[in-house]
Amino acid sequence: IKPLVGDNVEIEVIDKDNFKGNVVDILPRKNELIRPASANIDQAMVIFAVKTPEPNFNLLDKFILMMNYQDVPTVVCFNKEELADDEYKNELKKKYEGCGCECIFISAKNNIGIDRIMEVLKGKTTVLAGPSGVGKSTLTNLLIPDMEEQGEVSQTGEVSRIGRGRHTTRHSEIYNVCKQTYICDTPGFTSLNLPDVEKEDLRFYFEEFVPFEGKCRFNGCMHVSEPGCAVKQAVEDGIINYDRYKSYTDIFEEIKNKKKY
């Protein structure tokens, strides 16, 4: 069995003074994430910037899909909140709370919202994920003042001229924030492979669709082109966010085309 970040292990101490030992056993896992590769995770916190770089919502929706597929709750955190007005932030909050995620706005640069982040993290093991350049490393350094004692300080990277972040976290690493509270910091990503979900099952991982299951004209409606679809009607009525539905249809087509080859 291959060790993963977040594993609980049994060790054989070989140098007590210098805290050195060998792993002799990996204890049973309560869960195992494919990506980010980790184990014993309570929740995921995905971090995007509200601007600079502009958020890729399709990428965010894919991440939420991946976590739903792996039965891991997701907290959506938007950094650089000072760059957006209240109307835009309220739209984002409504959009992502509508799909079952807690939505938090922070400014790592100005130390705003960090107390709320600590409340959400407390007593849990949380995977931190997000694209490069969104301020994830800056946030990690704020959450763990003694990071240098635990390992390397996360280097922060500026956003490049083309608006994409530069990777700063090179590998996944787990840190102790406070008592019984851990974060698993992961490298930034610019793309995500879809989980191994069938297109017929995709709808079950979009939580805002769940109240409309069984209300469509046809059993097994996939909410794409079928007439009498309750989900499409909910989109027209403004009950389901249009952009989230568009992400669903885009991912549906991606899965369908992937299965052809």
Explain the meaning of each model-derived region:
Residues 56-59, 88-89:
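Residues at alpha-helix caps and immediate loop-helix transition turns in enzyme cores, especially N-
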Residues 58-68:
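Histidine-anchored nucleotide/phosphate-binding helix
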Residues 2-17, 27-44, 50, 66, ...:
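Helix-rich effector regions associated with P-loop NTPase G domains
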Residues 83-134:
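Canonical P-loop GTPase G-domain recognition
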Residues 53, 136, 191:
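Short glycine-rich, flexible loops that bind phosphorylated cofactors or substrates
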Residues 48-57:
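Short, glycine-rich nucleotide/cofactor-binding loops
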Residues 132, 137-138, 142:
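Walker A/P-loop
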Residues 45-46, 127:
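Conserved beta-strand elements of the Class I
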